[in-house]
Regions:
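Beta-propeller domain segments
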Residues: 23-36, 145, 163-166, 174, ...
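Surface loop/turn motifs at the tips and blade-to-blade linkers of beta-strand repeat domains
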Residues: 42-47, 87-92, 133-140, 188-192
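Asp-box/WD-like beta-propeller blade repeats and closely related beta-sheet repeat scaffolds
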Residues: 100, 112-151, 159-162, 185, ...
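Residue-level detector of Asp-centered blade-edge/turn motifs that repeat once per structural unit
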Residues: 55-58, 101-103, 150-153, 202-205
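Hydrophobic core register within WD40 beta-propeller blades
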Residues: 53, 99, 148, 196-199
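Conserved beta-propeller blade signature
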Residues: 60-64, 105-108, 155-159, 207-211
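A short helix->beta-strand "capping" segment at the edge of beta-propeller domains
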Residues: 26-48, 84
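Short loop/turn segments immediately following beta-strands, especially the blade-tip
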Residues: 74-80, 117-125, 232-237
Length: 259
């Protein structure tokens, strides 16, 4: 029960952290349908433009943002499942949406780079100077924000979206990259992905599952968004030739096998 509650609390934070100004009584929590045994509450309401989140080893919740350009740290000091204190651990960044935590360090993305803040939970009030993991990511703003996470192989994964609605561009666009924690060994893990903003690994098979937001201007609800899984490196998931698995693109799908 405790694990289920906390999972939904974090899910709820995804929806509620960016609401400002507000109180918990203003939020329509009753509209969120939950399975039996789950509960949802407001964790914090003072985090502007909240996006991705990750937990530190000591329970600090780190939150990325987009237009705010900040990375926040939320601390629940009395263990009542509500944030008691908020720190801004970085600011002035270009869409620092993605955050991940490994070996005591916070990893944070901006559009064209990934930074690392070492021993961050011991210095929230005086954050360390970040280490640049990589600054070689594309800087195009269209689908340019970078969500990040560590896989079960210890590699850091980052999707790189297509810089357009639909187009053909060379690597690393329309792909998911991975690299070692120090930024070395960067490689394309999967291709043909327009814009993935959510991904996770199956706890048993370790297979990567990820969403893909389909192209615009084909019609209402067309193409559908995708939920894909990649059991090995080197797979191609169709973009820009095929959408939703079996829908040829009117411009780029000629001759493509979308069956």
């Amino acid at each position: 029960m405790k694990q289920s509650y906390f999972s939904l609390l974090i899910f709820g934070a995804t929806l509620l952290l960016g609401v400002r100004p507000s109180t918990s009584t203003d939020l329509p929590l009753e509209l969120i349908n939950l399975p039996p045994g789950f509960a949802i509450e407001t964790f914090a309401t003072n985090v502007v433009n909240a996006r991705a989140m990750t937990l530190g080893h000591n329970g600090t919740l780190f939150v990325g943002s987009r237009s705010a350009g900040k990375i926040y740290a939320l601390v629940d000091e009395n263990q009542d499942m509500r944030s008691d204190k908020m720190y801004v651990v970085a600011e002035g960044l270009h869409a620092p949406i993605g955050v991940a935590f490994k070996d005591g360090s916070l990893y944070a993305s901006a559009v064209d780079r990934i930074l690392r803040y070492d021993n961050i939970e011991t210095s929230l009030d005086q954050p360390p100077v970040p280490v640049t993991v990589t600054k070689s990511l594309p800087n195009e703003r269209h689908h340019g924000w970078k969500f990040i996470d560590f896989g079960p192989d210890g590699m850091l994964y980052v999707p790189v979206g297509a810089p357009c609605n639909v187009c053909v561009r060379p690597d690393p666009f329309s792909s998911i990259l991975r690299m070692r924690p120090d930024g070395s060994g960067m490689e394309v893990f999967a291709r043909g992905i327009r814009n993935s903003v959510g991904f996770a690994w199956h706890p048993t098979t370790k297979t990567l599952w990820f969403t893909d937001n389909g192209r615009d201007n084909l019609g209402d609800d067309l193409p559908p968004g995708e939920l894909n899984h990649a059991h090995k490196i080197g797979l191609h998931f169709g973009f820009p030739h095929c959408h939703g698995g079996d829908i040829p693109d009117p411009q780029f799908g000629k001759g493509a096998d979308c069956s």
